């Protein structure tokens, strides 16, 4: 399998791109779960804060020096929840990380990776690790979750479509605040409740500004 992949390249035209943007606690993980495994959809099992990761000085050093083996191992270490166990989402995963690394390196070793190619290759490697097919038409779905991550992804992939999850504001507010209270007792304050409410407003305002060019109604 790996020998055949060494000289294999994917036509850029067969890929489209989409982001999942949440507006609070609105079911973005559920949406991604529904898309996971759909033929032609290439995605991870959860949120991927890629652009926060890529800004780290150590990551930039690995990219510059083409230390791709160290780079992908660090990615796995920093995104443990995507490969092994996601405690927050209560998910048990059993991804063959050795296979993932081999496939990623086969896709990357002959290239000078920038952040855009790196991001694309980790998605392809994950998809192929799960023994899923690359079809004639594919959509890479990035669970960006937050506005900053979404903006960064759109800058790299210009024709990205946004998949935006929304919910009744009252249920959204109650669920979000209660979830944070259960997760971190320090968040039990009016200040955090206000910040959460403001985040819902800001995320949805951003989504509305993008609706003409990027917005996809579900």
Residue spans for each PLM region:
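Extreme N-terminal, non-catalytic leader segments
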Residues: 1-17
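Conserved catalytic segments around the Walker B and adjacent sensor/switch elements
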Residues: 42-45
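Residue-level marker of structural boundaries
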Residues: 40, 50, 59, 181-182
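PAPS-dependent sulfotransferase catalytic domain
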Residues: 115, 129-218
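A conserved segment at the C-terminal end of the G1
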Residues: 28-40
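Walker A (P-loop) phosphate-binding loop of P-loop NTPases
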Residues: 25
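The Walker A (P-loop) glycine that initiates the GxxxxGKT/S ATP-binding motif of P-loop NTPases
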Residues: 21-22
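PAPS-dependent sulfation machinery
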Residues: 47-141
């Amino acid at each position: 399998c790996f020998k055949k992949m060494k000289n294999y390249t994917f036509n850029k035209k067969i890929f489209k791109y989409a982001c999942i943007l949440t507006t609070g606690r609105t079911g973005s993980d559920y949406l991604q779960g529904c898309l996971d495994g759909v033929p032609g959809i290439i995605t991870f099992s959860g949120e991927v804060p890629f652009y926060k990761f890529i800004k780290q000085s150590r990551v930039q050093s690995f990219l510059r020096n083409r230390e791709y083996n160290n780079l992908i191992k660090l990615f796995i270490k920093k995104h443990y929840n995507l490969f092994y166990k996601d405690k927050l989402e209560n998910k048990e995963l059993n991804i063959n990380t050795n296979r993932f690394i081999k496939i990623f390196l086969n896709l990357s070793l002959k290239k000078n990776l920038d952040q855009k190619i790196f991001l694309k290759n980790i998605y392809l490697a994950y998809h192929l690790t799960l023994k899923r097919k690359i079809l004639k038409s594919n959509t890479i779905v990035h669970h960006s979750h937050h506005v900053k991550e979404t903006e960064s992804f759109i800058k790299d992939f210009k024709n990205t479509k946004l998949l935006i999850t929304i919910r009744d504001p009252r249920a959204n507010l109650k669920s979000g605040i209660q979830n944070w209270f259960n997760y971190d007792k320090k968040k039990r304050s009016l200040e955090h409740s206000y910040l959460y409410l403001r985040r819902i407003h800001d995320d949805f305002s951003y989504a509305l500004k993008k609706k003409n060019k990027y917005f996809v109604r579900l």
